[in-house]
Amino acid sequence: MVDIGLSASGDSTRRKMEAFADCAVEVVPLDLYDSFRAKIAANLQWICAKAYGIDNVPEELKDPFYTDQYEQEHIKPPVIKLLLSSELYCRVCSLILKGDQVAALQGHQPVIQALSRKGIYIMESDDAPVSESDLSCCPIKMSAHMSMIDALMMAYTVEMISIEKVVASVKRFSTFSASKELPYDLEDAMVFWINKVNLKMREILEREQRIKQQVIESPSHPKVRYRRDHPSSRHLPYFPILEDLTKDISDGAALLAVIHFYCPEQMKLDDICLKEVTSMADSVYNIQLLKEFSNEYLNKCFYLTLEDMLYTPLVLKPNIMVFIAELFWWFENVKPEFVHPRDTQELKEAKIVMHPKTSRPQVPISNATKRSFLASPGSTTDSQATAASESCSSNYLQAEDAENGKGCAVFSPSHPLLPLRQKQQKSVKPEESLNHRDQANSLTRADGQPMASIIAWKEKKPRPLSQTFALHHAADDVESTSGDSISLARSISKDSLASNIVNPTPKHQSYPTPIKVLPKSLLGNVDIEDDEEELVAFIRSDDASCPGDLELQSVSSRASSQMSTSRLRRPADLESKPDSFFLEPLMPAVLKPAKEKHMVPKSEEYGEGKQKGFSSKRQNEGNQSFSRKKIINNHTGHDLNRTFTPLSSLESDPLRTDPVQLSIESGNGNFRPLATSSVESSEHGGGFFLHDLNADDDVEDKPSAGNLIMEDPHKPDTTWTVLRPGSENLDVGGCEEVAVSRPVGKYIGEEESVKLQEDLKLKEHDDKDDASGRSSPCLSTISQISSASMASGSMRMTSFAERKFQKLNSYETKSSTSSSQKTTPDGSECCPPPLTTWKQRREQSPGRQNRDHANVLASELVQLHMQLEEKRRVIEAQKKKMESLSARQRLKLGKAAFLHVVKKGKPETVAQPVKPEHGFRDYTKRTPEDIDTVSVNAKVEQYLESIDPGIVSSEVQEAFTDPKLKDPALLEADICNLMADANPEDIDSEIDVNECDLSIEKLNETISTLQQAIMKISQQQEMLMKAPSMAVPPLPSSSQDHKLKPSVQFVEPISPPGMPIVRKTTRFGQGRNARSLRVTEQKLAKEKMQSSSRVITPTNSIETVPHLKSVQPLKSPSVPTEESPVEVVPEQGSASQDKPTTGGFRLHNDNSQRTFVLSTSKDANIISEQMHREVISSSRVAGVSTSESSGKENVPVDERHKSSLIEVDLSDLKEPDEGEEESDHPEKTKDIISDDQKSGVGFFFKDEQKAEDELAKKRAAFLMKQQRKAEEARLRKRQLEAEVEQKRDDARRKAEEDRIRKDEEKARRELIKQEYLRRKQEQILEEQGLGRPKPKPKSKKTRPKSVHREESYSDSGTKYSSTPDNLSSAQSGSSLSLASGATTEAESVHSGGTPSHRVDCVDAPSGMGRHQSRNAERDWENASTASSIASVAEYSGPKLYKEPSSKSNKPLIHNAISHCCLAGKVNEAIKNSTLDELEKCDSNHYIILFRDAGCQFRALYSYYPETEEICKLTGTGPKNITKKMIDKLYKYSSDRKQFTVIPAKTMSASVDALTIHNHLWQAKRPALPKKNSLGK
């Protein structure tokens, strides 16, 4: 009797449900669910996980929200800072891009451009494109950032899944109609894949149910005792079919069914709640199950909450799509060891159930298998080939395994014992694998070695009739679907579903149990390898692992021998991989002899001892994460979190870490890095390999291991550390060595055929077209690392094409270091951007593999040019940004230092040192001449700020100012020594408090001296004003004509641009980002070289104006060009070479008349920056200008002497003097700026060696000059205000004239109208009025049409100028009035309420109105029905116009009544009655009667052209209308829904409406009914 546990796990779902119920999951109700917050949380969680790795996300980023004291949720500032800085986006985008593109990712704009090149455009919800300013603006604009993250998610999605991949996957296990079911976009492809998998699951369960029923009912079958209910009484699970991706996926059932299909062992079918109608509790349970599985096996790729999945708002659609794409990528690309698609096992179970007697349970190895091991004429080369093929086929995303001579297809066809897959690859490689490689996206296997799954997707071909199969997961397969606990091994063929039942094993007993029978023998080793390798072999690069290792050889000798012989006999059949690579016997026993012959121990093959119980443990502990398994098997002690952390140790000592860490997802349990864009399969960089390259024996000593000979097995690790995207390391050299050589290895002893080599060359280049993202660049940081490891491991070359590409691309590897593809000079960085628009994906031709190599090279060159150009722009932008940041930082520090100076030496106000990072960034962007200078400045500035700013040692000043210090290096060295002596940390201990007090006292003395000098200056004022020889030189003169000095002056006037000194002013932005003049380093360098005298010391200049770097120089008459040197001529003409000249600059606030004349010393810089900040914050600064020749000169002095600050009152100064300015380095300054805005106060520094009166003269001259400029500015401002006021007066006057003219025009129109009405009345009253109307049209033609049209406005009371009338705005509001207020001369009547579109251009401007209205009549006569009154056939009017015919105008009249004359709810009754009458009448032509030119509907008439009779059908009006009664004729335009007057008096079939003379109505006026009772 056979016990079949049909429902052994039947209550597992109940147990899990109860476990979940115990957790008491709280679900946020839908009305409290905030989809926008959920979107922010999901997007931020996703991008942080991708940027840092799921296990390395910083703690503050894991929950992006915080709650404030008012219970309001906000996004954490660190998160906002990261988003605004674009760091996250650059990190994530670098995982998608190719190598040399990654270096350019230095801001939002490069990321936007990179995505747009991939066909993904960042748009907000209102279809407005997201710009860089949207992403960097503060306060943060979250909608723009959400759009950016959505675009990155879409880029990831596109990299992981494509229509071609889905179709190829589905084709493997199902059929579909290409004309009806082919997906048209990614969303449709996802629905298509999920639905096909669910349909396949339905089919599998139904088939299993039928087979079990047959087994039970079969009379020849042994009796079966069921422990539980009969299987037929159980309902099959319901597998849902999706229609809408977001709505139908919310219960999780469809996705769990997909997971079960691929991982039946990990996701039991009985654990899934599959119901036709899913309750909320069932959905919650399924979603929790989905999340649990993702966290355990899929590297925690489920970034949504339970409510997100439950409610699936539309905004989360990209998040759901990227999760589905990741599922697809795991199951179809990476295929870790736990992936066992059900389609590979459905036939196995059927065959074993139907043929129970052909299998012998508990027989580990058959005799035939043993004979095949011993009898095979294998050689060392065979063994190498076998092992190499095994390792090759075990790597999924090793992009170019076979391409570089390393794949399975490399081996010579003369080898008699090729494995099944190897033979298949050989035969199908040129056609099928190439096609699929090109169709696949960047994450598919893009190499010459056709993955079994890829080949199987192409076509199902015949296979051997009988093949041995492993026990695999048979027990769980059956029981997971139907409750059976049968453990099945079987012999299978496509033609027969019958097989014998094997002895069942307990439900949870692992499949390798039978193998342990011969644990000590070599065959025992083989078996243990089998169970251990069962699926790991597919995804790792074990030296001896092979797909065939999966095969469990516990089968009957007949089956084994039959399979062995058939495999040798029928190689043609073996080309196919029929149902998938899972369906083929993964390795025949025949492959083992080579290994036995060499007796290679497993420990050596794997690089270390294997754990015998590993497989069993893995099966029993199905929830183990993949990373953990890898660690167990490798015995590695590495910290797996190293991948995502900056490892300086790796950078410094690359040999310290094992390359194995490259193959393992570091700390994530993630498989993504394992599926990398590697160049070689046997280097293990990207595959799941369980052995270490640092094996006991060198790789070269183990040719059977199938490894490439690598010059340095540690190199992959080196390359990985260089390429780590999160790293700040910019050292390129480490990877240049590796990348220069083509990393192509050659197997020892292998004999490549010429044909194979040619195929490989072809495939190399085709892979370059499609391999841009095969590292799953989107997937994690380690994928890039693995790719680097692949590229760097070997220095051998086997292909000339590779050498050519290496020459072409090796220099590109030096350009950037943060890309996954950088060190793989396989051309992948040059390939064109992958197609990412879905339409392009659908249209992507499979013939791309035949692309000419020249085209590839051309596209590479174009791409390279674009990338370099973009990189250049990015660097320039970054340079400007860094300079402005540095300027602002220094400005802040200057202000802090200045405040410190003026606060009587309070120690707590010491300025904070400059952050080194700003300086270092700037240094990289400068010319070599400037780098020394800037570095010196930064160090000096740090030193000066670290101590009391007033107490600068004389040594520092000497270093700054000594002209003999020509060498910046010497200056830097001296300053470094000084800084070392006065370290900021030792400030408290080194600075003497008494010295501070003395400095403050000295400052007070200086202030008192300044006050005394004020009186002297006022007394000398008259003398200074009258001194002709000391007059200031004219400002507009050239700077070369006068004595120049290197001081730079900055004038910031409040007046409008136009002062004599300023030709062009620069407007300040928002009052906060002050734009100031830039003293460029190039200019300084040039001056330093060209000037015959000592020019502005670069150190001083840069120190003086650090915050003015980012603004272009302004052009003023007195500013020399950048190319011209600035001459320095001291006043005495003495040797200026020996004395330094220090630049000073002035800050002038026009409003307060305060002027600072400052030296370039540190304190002067502080004061200037403080004043500059005050001017900016006051928002009164209008511009900036420079003046190199404003009459100010530097007098060289001994810089070691101290100087004092002198305050000068400017209120009494009136005439400037040509004084000379002396700038010295003061120790202290004090803020004595007066609050009085009227009195000007100037600061300057006096030299104690000079007479105070002489100094006063010089300073007074400059201060007076500034005051005069301020006066001129105020005068100019008053002039401008007067001009503006004059313009306003002119505008008012003009408006008044226009109004008067309009009134006159209105009166004139009224007069004309009255005259016209009078003449019209006279005409009507005449007895023979028939003959006289003929001259009327002529007179009307001579008069401009706009006159008639404009008359209408006198009735309506509206005021319009000479523009054509706008009837819609002059309506009275009556629904029956189509143009109320229009006179009888109105040319076109528009239906009520809609804008007027008249034939004669109603919207014409006033100047054009008369001319166009004059032409309107001509247009009508030339292009309308007036020319075809006699003959309708001659009509040549507008196309939209319904040409009148002799048939009928009933539809036209029907349209007019419905939509124009009687439109609206108010007129519904009269409209219906009128239309009824219209339908009843059988006449061909109808006429509408209007009351007057206002086109108010009155009646409907039928017209008989033969007799010219017009008879009333319904409405108010005469019974019959004769020719004499007709006043105006109208034509209806059905497209415009309006009537237009016809300039004719003769009735014809083209007329749709008319009016009768007014006197006819007037006679009956008392009897007229109201408008709403017209339908009589």
UniProtKB/Swiss-Prot annotation:
Composition skew (Polar residues), residue ranges: 613-626, 642-651, 1178-1189, 1354-1366, 1383-1394
Record's keyword terms, sorted: Coiled coil, Cytoplasm, Cytoskeleton, Microtubule
Chain segments annotated as coiled-coil in the UniProt record: 857-889, 992-1022, 1254-1315
Region entry Disordered, spans: 415-447, 549-572, 595-653, 811-852, 1108-1149, 1178-1236, 1274-1422
Keyword Ligase among record annotations: no
Molecular function in Gene Ontology: calmodulin binding; microtubule binding; microtubule minus-end binding; spectrin binding
Biased composition (Basic residues): 1333-1346
Biased composition (Basic and acidic residues): 428-439, 595-611, 840-852, 1195-1204, 1225-1236, 1274-1323
Location(s), subcellular: Cytoplasm, Cytoskeleton
Biased composition (Low complexity): 554-566, 813-824, 1116-1131, 1367-1382
Residue ranges occupied by any Calponin-homology (CH) domain in the UniProt entry: 217-332
Record GO cellular component, one term: microtubule minus-end
InterPro entries reported for this sequence: CAMSAP, CAMSAP-like_CH_dom, CAMSAP_CC1, CH_dom, CH_dom_sf, CKK_dom_sf, CKK_domain, PRC_barrel-like_sf
One GO term of the biological process aspect: microtubule cytoskeleton organization
All copies of domain CKK, residue ranges: 1437-1571
Gene3D superfamilies according to UniProt: Calponin-like domain, CKK domain
Main localization category: cytoplasm
Function in brief: Key microtubule-organizing protein that specifically binds the minus-end of non-centrosomal microtubules and regulates their dynamics and organization. Specifically recognizes growing microtubule minus-ends and stabilizes microtubules. Acts on free microtubule minus-ends that are not capped by microtubule-nucleating proteins or other factors and protects microtubule minus-ends from depolymerization.
Family: Belongs to the CAMSAP1 family.
This protein's domain notes: The CKK domain binds microtubules.
Protein name in UniProt: Calmodulin-regulated spectrin-associated protein 1
Organism: Xenopus laevis (African clawed frog)
UniProt lineage: Eukaryota, Metazoa, Chordata, Craniata, Vertebrata
